[in-house]
Amino acid sequence: MKNTGKRIDLIANRKPQSQRVLYELRDRLKRNQFILNDTNPDIVISIGGDGMLLSAFHKYENQLEKVRFIGLHTGHLGFYTDYRDFELDKLVTNLQLDTGARVSYPVLNVKVFLENGEVKIFRALNEASIRRSDRTMVADIVINGVPFERFRGDGLTVSTPTGSTAYNKSLGGAVLHPTIEALQLTEIASLNNRVYRTLGSSIIVPKKDKIELIPTRNDYHTISVDNSVYSFRNIERIEYQIAHHKIHFVATPSHTSFWNRVKDAFIGEVDE
């Protein structure tokens, strides 16, 4: 069975096993008449781990409606694993049978407003975190224009449902199924004593809601967006909302369901 002209981009990390898989898969795709295209692909195959999938997402974050993703892992199982490195024949066969079906997950939109009028816009697949560079961060949390609390602590992170299994989970946040289009705000080492209090638990807000963080001091803050880190001074406010666009994965018989991904990543085999 031959392909009908699908354009595919392969993105791999520099590890020897990933590079070996990259060359082998590239050869198989060419032999089956797929088109390799690294600017306007139909499908992007990430080879490596979850970090590589995040890099692939950010490379094509402005083409999300036109691109579908596949995660091919060359190491231990990751959350975004669709195929393992020994399943290349299976992957190529499923690509030949592909009908365009997709599985979609929400994406986080982040707007950083600076006091000089600049606005920096980011998208995150997993989460966006903010910390103060050298001391306790103090920031007002506003939900839909209504002041909620004044936070004091190391920082805050806002995660998507798929990102709820990443940094958010290590902070004690809840795991959300991606069909629940919501954001989760989780504290990083909040300061709670007789003088200062915060809610002390994660906040889950629905798709239509907007979370604003307003730092009370104008010094440097570090903002992490997935696997990228930025430093800003004189932040006026930061807005977080579910983005209009979603990330789409190729829906094949091998696409692992969300709860199976959670089980494989964190629990493993369950004894009967």
Curated annotation (Swiss-Prot):
Family annotation (Gene3D superfamilies): Probable inorganic polyphosphate/atp-NAD kinase, domain 1 (3.40.50.10330), Probable inorganic polyphosphate/atp-NAD kinase, domain 2 (2.60.200.30)
One GO cellular component, as annotated: cytoplasm
Annotated catalysed reactions: NAD(+) + ATP = ADP + NADP(+) + H(+)
Membrane-spanning residues: none
Pfam families per UniProt: NAD_kinase_C
Cofactor(s) annotated in UniProt: a divalent metal cation
Keywords: ATP-binding, Cytoplasm, Kinase, NAD, NADP, Nucleotide-binding, Transferase
InterPro entries: ATP-NAD_kinase_N (IPR017438), ATP-NAD_kinase_PpnK-typ_C (IPR017437), NAD/diacylglycerol_kinase_sf (IPR016064), NADK (IPR002504)
Residues forming coiled coils: none
Compartment(s): Cytoplasm
Known EC number: 2.7.1.23
Binding site for NAD(+): D50, G51, N126, E127, R152, D154, T165, A166, Y167, N168, K169, S170, A189
BP-aspect Gene Ontology terms: NAD metabolic process; NADP biosynthetic process
Active site per UniProt: D50
Keyword Transcription regulation: no
Any one GO molecular function term: metal ion binding
Enzyme superclass (EC): transferase
Family: Belongs to the NAD kinase family.
Biological function: Involved in the regulation of the intracellular balance of NAD and NADP, and is a key enzyme in the biosynthesis of NADP. Catalyzes specifically the phosphorylation on 2'-hydroxyl of the adenosine moiety of NAD to yield NADP.
Name assigned to this protein: NAD kinase
Lineage: Bacteria, Bacillati, Bacillota, Bacilli, Lactobacillales
